[in-house]
């Protein structure tokens, strides 16, 4: 990506040798995620040029000095929430909010990626829309060799983000009523998480009849087509007093505000979607006095070294519906078309598969 709003280009770049604590990974698969699209459109910002991609899996090819966690041949899923293990948030059990930058290369060191001697930014310190990645060892987790990596890649972002928002951030109790706005990969994962956690009423909201049909496969007990009916009124009709929990998985100001209107007194709204930078939310201040909670979820409040192996087990035991989530498998050359299909709402998830 050379500038926001421009198509992605396929180019040759240089990748450095692994330094201390670093791992080189041969990329096997990478999901096409909305988070990358925000940077491509310029709704969020980073240094250019950059290599996007963060939802990925692959095989370790080489390790640098002091690497003890993985070795060549290990199958891994990457995660952008790398951790240090010693900062305030890490020691409090919230590594997803790690305050350290020690897993980045320090200023003055060579860039991990470069082109003609000029640095190329790794988006989220991963840059997985490439044949190989160079990451810190604390940005990946080993997984079983019988886990298909083209589905395992999705666990590194969409699945962990949506599923984790339900079970880690909200910690919904058995029997809770849940509404999820947005039935892309993250929203479908939130529905799946609600079903696994034992929610009672599970409502999916979207404007795509195709996505709403898929939502039932992932655990929705009811669906609401927001293009033909008032979603707030529909949720209140289904839950009588409003849902116990709502999850916004779109990333729009309007849908966050709708999600908050959908919950009952004492209920909780969890924002998962990436609302554009600078956007302000408007909510009824009086509702706060009725103990209606509005909170965010960063990458599903994950502890990914523990959560990802558990999600792998859920998939292999049939509880996590990754096969149904993968709508298309494409080559890297088709990446712009894959983003166009996602923008048009034609797919739940496309996966780039590398030979």
PLM feature spans:
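Short Gly/Pro-enriched turn/cap motifs at secondary-structure boundaries
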Residues: 3, 14-15, 47-53, 121-125, ...
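Local beta-strand N-terminus motif with an aromatic residue
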Residues: 73, 175, 220, 242-243, ...
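Glycine-rich beta-strand-centered segment in the early N-terminal region that forms part
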Residues: 16-30, 43-91, 96, 142-146
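Glycine-rich cofactor phosphate-binding loops and adjacent beta1-alpha1 units
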Residues: 170-174, 186, 196-197, 207-209, ...
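Mid-domain Rossmann-like dinucleotide-binding core that forms the NAD(H)/NADP(H) cofactor-binding site
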Residues: 72, 131, 138-140, 144-229, ...
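Cysteine-cluster motifs in flexible loop/terminal segments that predominantly coordinate metals
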Residues: 79-138
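C-terminal hydrophobic helical "lid"/dimerization subdomain
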Residues: 257-261, 265, 287, 305-355
């Amino acid at each position: 990506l050379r500038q926001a709003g421009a198509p992605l280009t396929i180019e040759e770049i240089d990748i450095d040798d692994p330094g201390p604590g670093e791992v080189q990974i041969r990329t096997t698969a990478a999901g096409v995620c909305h988070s990358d699209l925000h940077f491509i459109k310029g709704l969020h910002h980073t240094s250019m040029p950059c290599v996007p991609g963060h939802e990925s899996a692959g095989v370790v090819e080489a390790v640098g000095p002091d690497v003890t966690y993985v070795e060549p041949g290990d199958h891994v899923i990457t995660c952008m929430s790398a951790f240090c293990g010693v900062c305030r948030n890490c020691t409090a059990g919230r590594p997803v909010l790690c305050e350290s930058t020690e897993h980045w290369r320090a200023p003055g060191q060579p860039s991990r990626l470069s082109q003609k001697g000029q640095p190329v930014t790794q988006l989220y310190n991963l840059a997985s829309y490439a044949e190989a990645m160079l990451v810190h060892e604390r940005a990946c987790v080993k997984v079983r060799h019988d886990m298909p990596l083209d589905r395992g890649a999705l666990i590194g972002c969409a699945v962990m983000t949506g599923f984790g928002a339900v079970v880690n951030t909200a910690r919904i109790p058995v029997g809770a009523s849940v509404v999820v706005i947005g039935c892309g990969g993250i929203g479908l994962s939130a529905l799946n998480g609600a079903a696994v956690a034992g929610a009672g009423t599970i409502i999916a909201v979207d404007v795509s009849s195709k996505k709403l049909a898929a939502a039932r496969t992932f655990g929705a007990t009811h669906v609401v087509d927001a293009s033909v009916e008032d979603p707030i009124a529909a949720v209140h009709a289904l839950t009588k007093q409003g849902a116990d929990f709502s999850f916004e998985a779109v990333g729009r100001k309007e849908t966050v505000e709708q999600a908050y209107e959908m919950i009952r007194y004492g209920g909780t709204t969890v924002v998962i979607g990436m609302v554009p930078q600078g956007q302000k939310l408007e909510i009824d201040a009086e509702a706060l006095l009725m103990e209606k909670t509005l909170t965010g979820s960063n990458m599903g409040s994950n502890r990914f070294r523990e959560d990802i192996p558990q999600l792998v087990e859920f998939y292999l035991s049939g509880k996590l519906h990754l096969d149904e989530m993968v709508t298309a498998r494409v080559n890297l050359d088709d990446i712009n078309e894959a983003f166009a299909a996602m923008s048009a709402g034609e797919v739940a998830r496309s996966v780039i598969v590398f030979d």
